[in-house]
From Swiss-Prot:
GO-annotated molecular function: DNA binding
Source organism: Caulobacter vibrioides (strain ATCC 19089 / CIP 103742 / CB 15) (Caulobacter crescentus)
Domain of life (superkingdom): Bacteria
Pfam families: CsgG
Skewed-composition ranges (Basic and acidic residues): 314-337
Region (Disordered) residue spans: 303-337
GO cellular component: a single term: outer membrane-bounded periplasmic space
Alphabetized InterPro entries for the sequence: Curli_assmbl/transp-comp_CsgG, Holdfast_HfaB
Keyword Isomerase set for record: no
Record flagged with keyword Oxidoreductase: no
Functional note: Required for the attachment of the holdfast to the cell. May be involved in the positive regulation of hfaC.
Protein known as: Putative transcription activator protein HfaB
Biased composition annotated in UniProt, kind: Polar residues: 303-313
Gene3D superfamilies for this protein: ABC-type transport auxiliary lipoprotein component
Amino acid sequence: MMVKRTGAVLALLATAALSACGSTPVASTAGNYAKPIGTAPVTANPTDYSSALVCLNQYARTNRIVAPRIAIGRIADYTGKEESDGSGRKVTQGASLMAVSAFAKAGMPLVERFDTSVSEFELKYANNKLISDRPNPAPDAPADFRKILAGQVPGSDFYVIGGITELNYNIRSAGIDAYAGDKDTDGLKGNFRRRVFIMNIALDLRLVNTRTLEVVDVISYQKQVVGREVSAGVFDFLNGNLFDISAGRGALEPMQLAVRALIERATVEMAANLYGMPGPESCLRFDPFGDATVGQTGAFTPAYNNLGTNNAQTRDDPSRWNARRDPDIRDAKRGRY
């Protein structure tokens, strides 16, 4: 009788749970059905080579080295690897964007060649005298049109191209499986599993002289990526009831961050060559945070004289501008509402 009552209660609870899952949610007063979880702040995204890039910039700045202008071309994914469910590529398609950030961290002057669609569009309109930098508020009145001047676009001295050329799965793996328990069918049993696997990814880049098309620098690097998985479980019968409890934990080194590390390492070597930097020992003589416009998030050209409060180092601060962490923003929000 007790078993039947327990079964009925479980069935009732399951029905109630399913009905709750299938019910239509009600929007809150804020207008949302659900509040997203997670409050992690936006942070810088450095690799182990980001500090070296910033050091290169400081070296060039201190020694007053005039750096060549760099353009970033197509750094494509040549691995051909795709997700099994067809949801996309295994490897990031944004390697060129990572290279732009890397050369910016090194303080290299950059000219845009990767996406010139907006500039080309406005150049076309300017050529037809349709664009003005001081538009007239009256819609039917003519205005001064933008002039196209000879030589107004700076050219590049070198450009970077290449690709992600290797993605090798499971080049090595190791693990252990253990199972132990009572020999009786209804006795306590347990299992343990541990797995470690290693894969690698490779990059090939080249630096080309824009005027002569000479390839002046070629770099090929690979990086290994490690993953691990640990799980354990217990299986038992207690008073006629079945209990199966399992727990596990796994971690995989970020694949796309490995691509960024490859690009930053290659950029360090290329930039050090262009700057004529002796080697890492030169970083000991310089403050890697000495330039207020270059940091581990990239580089910028200040629009106003406010580098004392807005600079490359403040951009690295994960609490800055965050309504949960920055007291100035929190107080402003409280005062507004």
